[in-house]
A protein has these predicted regions:
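N-terminal Sec-pathway targeting helices
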Residues: 1-18
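Surface-exposed, short loops/turns at beta-strand junctions within beta-sandwich domains
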Residues: 119-129, 234-241
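Low-complexity, Pro/Ser/Thr- and charge-rich linker/hinge segments at domain boundaries
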Residues: 154-163, 177-192, 260-287
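Cationic-aromatic interfacial patches
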Residues: 169-171, 177-257
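Surface-exposed, glycine-biased beta-strand/turn segments
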Residues: 257-362
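Zn2+-dependent peptidoglycan hydrolase active-site motif and core
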Residues: 333, 347-382, 404-408
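Short, well-structured beta-strand-loop connectors
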Residues: 344-354, 386-401
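Conserved, short, structured surface segments that act as functional micro-motifs
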Residues: 366-369, 390-434
């Protein structure tokens, strides 16, 4: 029995020595090279690490070996960056990130994750300092579970993933000077009467909307993923030739010239229209005119518009000169359709109903705001099925059609050609998704 016990003890000691040897070899051969690649970029420039701590698995993930370097006061200088929103490129392994950006005097302008940074706008050009930490944490784990330590220390692996992988972080400290200049692009240099020109303004700092001025109409800018968007109307009666467009942004004014081309919309015979009463005109002005210059909401439409009347015949078209008893009169800023009573009147595009009521001048009236100053004015419905403030989707019934529907599509106060909207043509749909 004594010999057997001695044998058991010797075997156990041998196994322990073998495990110790294996662990020693594993420990010795586990080097800093087992840490993930630290490659990260800001504004297209490679960032240098300023401190790290990693736990690299040993023995199949039962233990971790620590590799660490403390952060220092060193700050990498990136120089001058000329884009308003420098891109951040991360390594594939980064699962949790923190980023802090402050001005030269220490005021924090951003604190959050790298994904949240994507929607951040720098308040102004100038000098900035940033600190970024990139973590690799196992799925189901948290950064607070990370023990860390000094190089060479052993830690118990969390056991949250198989095979076990390194867990830890790299820190980056860098400073840069932002010197961005606005970039303005137009969907076209020339536009026919009735058309729309899209404007994209990018590469600017701050959240103050650019100001666009032109004699073609009132233009408002709205936020977009790449900066700001605006839409310029060339109404049926816009004078042909060059029109200056002045864009004020970041303290500078840039001037561009758009050329309006004439278009022959033809003529149409119409019956004399009865004169409206002063009361009806006043009611219409009070209800509708204020919408022309109302603040623009975010862009809500997506893709082309649909004709509110699925089945119709055109009686008076946009831009046509109305002829009564052989005498030429005014040009039509709207389109009048012969429609089938009782059929649905459809929302031309996504939007918000801003007017839904009966008016003496135009009958049952629905106005839908599609954002960016673009609105649909629908007159003469048999019945109204929506209320003011209601959100509607393209094709949704907003009421029932009568015998005639008058539709007017305006950017601000200027009417545009509806058929271009139905054909998804022109600047309203230019680079819709960026």
């Amino acid at each position: 029995m004594k010999r057997f016990l001695l044998w058991i003890i010797s075997v156990a000691l041998g196994v322990a020595l073998l495990l110790a040897a294996v662990m020693g070899v594993s420990y010795a051969f586990t080097t800093q090279g087992g840490c993930p690649d630290a490659a990260a970029q800001f504004g297209g420039q490679e960032l240098e690490t300023n401190g790290f701590c990693w736990q690299v698995p040993l023995l199949g993930g039962r233990l971790d070996k620590v590799f660490a370097s403390p952060a220092t006061l060193t700050v990498q200088k990136l120089g001058t960056l000329y884009t308003a929103h420098p891109d951040i490129t991360l390594p594939d392994w980064a699962s949790y990130t923190t980023l802090t950006i402050q001005t030269a005097v220490g005021s924090v302008v951003f604190a959050g994750s790298v994904s949240e940074y994507q929607s951040f706008l720098f308040p102004a050009n100038g000098e900035y300092k940033a600190e970024m930490t990139l973590w690799r944490v196992p799925k189901g784990g948290m950064a607070t579970q990370f023990e860390g330590g000094s190089t060479g220390a052993l830690r118990k692996n969390l056991g949250l993933e198989r095979p076990a992988k390194p867990t830890g972080w790299y820190r980056y400290s860098f400073r840069f000077t932002l010197q961005a200049s606005a970039d303005i692009a137009f969907s076209a240099e020339r536009v026919e009467q009735g058309g729309i020109v899209g404007v994209r303004i990018s590469g600017m700092t701050g959240d103050t909307a650019p100001a666009v001025e032109t004699d073609l109409g009132s233009v408002q800018c709205v936020r977009a993923a790449d900066g700001w968007r605006a839409y310029i109307p060339a109404a049926y009666n816009a004078s042909s030739g060059g029109h200056a467009v002045n864009v004020a942004v970041n303290g500078e004014t840039l001037t561009h010239t758009l050329v309006v081309l004439p278009k022959d919309f033809g003529t149409v015979e119409v019956d004399p229209e009865p004169a409206a009463t002063d009361a009806a005109n006043a009611e219409f002005r009070n209800a509708v005119w204020g919408l022309y210059e109302a603040p623009a909401r975010e862009k809500l439409w997506a893709g082309g518009f649909v004709n509110p009347a699925e089945n119709s015949m055109t009686l008076v078209d946009y831009g046509q000169v109305k002829v009564t008893n052989g005498q030429q009169g005014s040009r039509s800023n709207s389109t009048k359709l012969y429609t089938i009573p009782g059929e649905p009147c459809r929302a031309p595009a996504n939007g918000v109903v801003v007017l839904a009521r009966n008016l003496a001048l135009t009958g049952n009236t629905v106005v839908i705001d599609h954002g960016a100053g673009m609105r649909s004015y629908l007159y003469g419905l048999q019945a109204i099925a929506v209320s003011e403030g209601q959100t509607v989707e393209k094709g949704q019934a907003v009421g029932a059609l009568g015998e005639e529907l008058t539709m007017d599509y305006k950017l601000g106060s200027k009417s545009v050609n509806p058929w271009l909207l139905f054909q998804t043509a022109g600047g309203l749909f230019w680079k819709e998704n960026g």
